[in-house]
């Protein structure tokens, strides 16, 4: 075979990379992503300004929001971005630390791969380390009393201090706590807190941030359909529909042949009678407000107005669900089936206000709302979007604590405690595995190290003294004060994080590192046919889909 042409198995326009080259490529991609985000950790974090393709601006220091906007080529970088999204959906906080940790885990593994250690050895050490990390975290966690308002505000505050909104921290903490407490829903001993669905954030530019508040009820961006309808109703009876109050046209196309002209008037009359019947079904229940997801014809408006009923049309389905939860109404699909128990009487006030140039309907002062609207005011759209992102994080933290009331110390303290525990355990280990195992402990120190770097203090001196501190008894709550860059006891500073967030961060970071270490071959697929003719033989870059 030596003299013959090499046998081509893969087609000519695919490119294959394998072995060490791929592994170091993946590790570098992950490190690059981690470096982008590194300065966004802690209370002294920097903001990033991103321009999207449409020319809009995003200004944020939320790890997930930054990575969402970045377009990357390398497949390993894509999976890094994916984990920050998972973290955001799962626990809503810790998106920055999960990326930094995963990047660091891969970075310490590179050294072993260079020494020809097999990736599987590194992986099994990482897995073992993860189990020990989880058990150590659970050991240092403390239970929390969720009914104590000050404690809860303190926890939310430690999540908010790293964000833009920290200037208004007490306002933001109260908003987040009230909103989450409102949408908390218990049945048969099962807690359900659905923030996405029932706690809506409405942003209205104008005013100042101090004007923001949580409404005990719902606000929608709609006006009444007829100018003479009432705009201020106390204790309204509310009917919610998801059908239209218009003449129903048949599903299939129908043709009517008219021979006499009286028939024509009869047809119009039938349409009118149909609408009148619909309205009468509603009017029987004597509601004050009718809200529907579909349209309301002029004639129906006329009948409703004569009965002194306010009508609001084309409301979003999600808003309608929220109104139903807030005032206790049921959404009805057919007006003729309306019954007394479908009417919502839980709201204390319906009023329509003009804010800026637009009209908003407020349904507030609900007796026992299970949905709420957070009204945000602020100078510009960019600020509002950032404040909204921060509030979402704060609400998620609050939700995590309510669902799983366990806390671990923040400020890099839990990382150092876990790292110390791992180092102690590795002393008893024999064989090659102890080195990658010890490296995990080293990787965990990236969190306190980054906190120290971001506030401009001396990294080496502080980290060494922090390590020394953690070797002493009962010092596992010592960490870095991100504001000043000094070492403090987190118990005194009152910076705590939910255990759920930390567990998820560690699991995700280690799993991702393991996943990327497993890859030893990248085959990039075909290029488009058009490209092929123009650049014959030029293989696409690794990672181009």
Swiss-Prot record:
The modification Phosphoserine is found at residues 11, 170, 243-244, 252. Mg(2+) binds at residue 93. Residues 1-24, 526-545 are annotated as: Disordered. ATP binds at residues 42, 94-96, 411, 482, 497. The modification N-acetylmethionine is found at residue 1. It is an enzyme of class 3 (hydrolase). Disulfide bonds join 366-372. It catalyses: ATP + H2O = ADP + phosphate + H(+). The modification N6-acetyllysine is found at residue 222. The modification Phosphothreonine is found at residues 430, 459. Gene3D superfamilies: GroEL, GroEL-like equatorial domain, TCP-1-like chaperonin intermediate domain. It is found in: Cytoplasm. GO terms for molecular function: ATP binding; ATP hydrolysis activity; ATP-dependent protein folding chaperone; unfolded protein binding. GO terms for biological process: binding of sperm to zona pellucida; chaperone mediated protein folding independent of cofactor; positive regulation of telomere maintenance via telomerase; protein folding; protein stabilization. Component of the chaperonin-containing T-complex (TRiC), a hexadecamer composed of two identical back-to-back stacked rings enclosing a protein folding chamber. Each ring is made up of eight different subunits: TCP1/CCT1, CCT2, CCT3, CCT4, CCT5, CCT6A/CCT6, CCT7, CCT8. Interacts with PACRG. Interacts with DNAAF4. Interacts with DLEC1. Component of the chaperonin-containing T-complex (TRiC), a molecular chaperone complex that assists the folding of actin, tubulin and other proteins upon ATP hydrolysis. The TRiC complex mediates the folding of WRAP53/TCAB1, thereby regulating telomere maintenance. As part of the TRiC complex may play a role in the assembly of BBSome, a complex involved in ciliogenesis regulating transports vesicles to the cilia. This is T-complex protein 1 subunit gamma. It comes from Bos taurus. The lineage of its organism: Eukaryota, Metazoa, Chordata, Craniata, Vertebrata.
